């Protein structure tokens, strides 16, 4: 007997190899046997990947086990090379489970999730991103999530996307945390199944920012009350950065305005373009506090079709 590649698979065809599939004569039993072989191969590769993940953990030492920029690069590469009828959304979901399981193999990994009174689906977004087996604790306040990440009791915190003019927004607390190594490092969902419906979350962690190749940066900008959104956007663009969303804190009597600025591209804490915004002579802002960098998520259109056809 022998085996013969047919339409990308190997079929056992007996003593005289023939293109049974082309002739429409492939038996269901033969196809099922081939699927079993593929399943075994996939399982072998997952076990091999897990062994490598353990070796990576040994090489990392005390380095953080979670690298969201690296995860984004993996998923982008897979979507780029994908073809055939298998749904892209399902491909991402499978790899998210695999990646998250591998992260947990490398060390302690706990997630703190903010679940406010008005549910904004942080719980569901966290489950979808980090997997059904990821250990999670749920908190009624954003400040508790920030504290859990800062003191190390949680590896990652999940907080709802800020909205304009929120009272006591969590991002101002993050900006005011002294000697802070915690920053935003991911945005959820990374692979939305439908166009944006307003639901979303940021992940925070005590890890150094890394470039993924397509990123967005977050800064808290303190300005005088006379600075309008339009003027601030113009100044950001003049500094060489493409502006994104501007979220404002409600006006107070301390004679300052504070904006959460979402900027296109990677900009770290010492970025020269940010320094232009706070230049004492002609800068528009009195201070700029780095809040984080996250890999740009997929658009729903990137993964909405059934496959790569």
What is each model feature region?
Residues 10-309:
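Domain-level signature for soluble enzymes in the chorismate/prephenate branch of the shikimate pathway
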């Amino acid at each position: 007997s022998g085996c013969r590649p047919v339409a990308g698979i190997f079929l056992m065809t007996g003593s005289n190899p023939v293109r049974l599939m082309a002739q429409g004569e492939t038996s269901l039993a033969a196809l099922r046997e081939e699927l079993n072989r593929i399943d075994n191969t996939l399982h072998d590769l997952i076990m091999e990947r897990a062994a490598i993940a353990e070796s990576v953990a040994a090489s990392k030492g005390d380095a953080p086990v979670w690298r969201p920029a690296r995860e984004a690069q993996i998923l982008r590469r897979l979507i780029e090379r994908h073809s055939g009828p298998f749904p892209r959304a399902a491909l991402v979901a499978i790899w998210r489970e695999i990646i998250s399981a591998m992260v947990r193999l490398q060390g302690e990994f706990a997630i703190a999730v903010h679940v406010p009174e008005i549910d904004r689906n942080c719980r569901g977004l966290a489950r979808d991103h980090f997997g059904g087996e990821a250990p999670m604790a749920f908190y009624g306040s954003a400040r508790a999530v920030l504290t859990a990440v800062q003191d190390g009791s949680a590896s990652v915190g999940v907080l709802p996307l800020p909205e304009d003019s929120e009272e006591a927004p969590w991002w101002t607390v993050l900006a005011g945390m002294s000697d802070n190594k915690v920053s935003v490092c991911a945005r959820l969902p990374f692979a939305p199944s439908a166009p944006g419906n307003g639901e979303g979350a940021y992940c925070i962690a005590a890890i150094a920012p890394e470039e993924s190749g397509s990123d967005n940066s977050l800064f808290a900008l303190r300005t005088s009350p006379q600075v309008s959104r339009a003027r601030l956007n113009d100044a950001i663009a003049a500094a060489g950065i493409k502006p994104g969303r501007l979220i404002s804190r409600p006006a107070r009597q301390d004679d300052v305005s504070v904006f959460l600025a979402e900027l296109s591209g990677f900009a770290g804490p010492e970025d020269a373009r940010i320094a232009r915004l706070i230049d004492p002579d002609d800068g528009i802002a009195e201070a700029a506090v780095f809040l984080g960098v996250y890999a740009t998520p997929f658009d729903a259109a990137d993964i909405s079709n059934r496959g790569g056809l």
